[in-house]
Amino acid sequence: MGTPTIATIVFPARDFEAGVAAWSSVFGTGPTFSSSGQQTPPGEADFAVFKTPDLEIGLTSLPWVDAPLVFIDADDIEQKRRELIDSGATALGEVADGSLAEIGTAPITNGDPETGVVEVPGAKLAVVRLADGNLLGLRQALPVAW
């Protein structure tokens, strides 16, 4: 197994509009993708992405991230997820209020209820809690047919 590539770092943005403005200032341009920026019901994201040649910076107002969350690229997200679980990680999934819960402890409302894997345009995503308590995101790129 080679060294994983860091794909994305997602930051919490409790004040979504202020977060987008701050990161736009950092990059000197607006996000390459952004939801409407309007407050949305629980479980629906205000989300923005800033892309660089090597890394994506994401902002989310959902409660599933309260500290920066690193996503690594995985060629096969299900295999990588299983490997991490076999080494002591815990699979997480998104529940109704937009937060994360251990699979099997609450109904998963976004993604596969058995694995927590979510498909979004261009990627499959999963989050695990590593044995040391830190969260790690996994991302598998998918072809996009626009």
Predicted regions and their residues:
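Core segments of cupin and vicinal oxygen chelate
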Residues: M1-P4, V10-L55
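A short linear hydrophobic-aromatic micro-motif
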Residues: T32, I57-L59, A91-G93
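Residue-level structural signal for beta-strand termini and adjacent loop
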Residues: G37, L62-P63, D97, A141
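Short acidic/glycine-enriched loop/turn segments that link adjacent beta-strands
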Residues: T40-D46, V65-D66, L100-A101, V120-K124
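Short, charged/polar, Gly/Pro-enriched secondary-structure boundary elements
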Residues: D54-G58, G133-L135
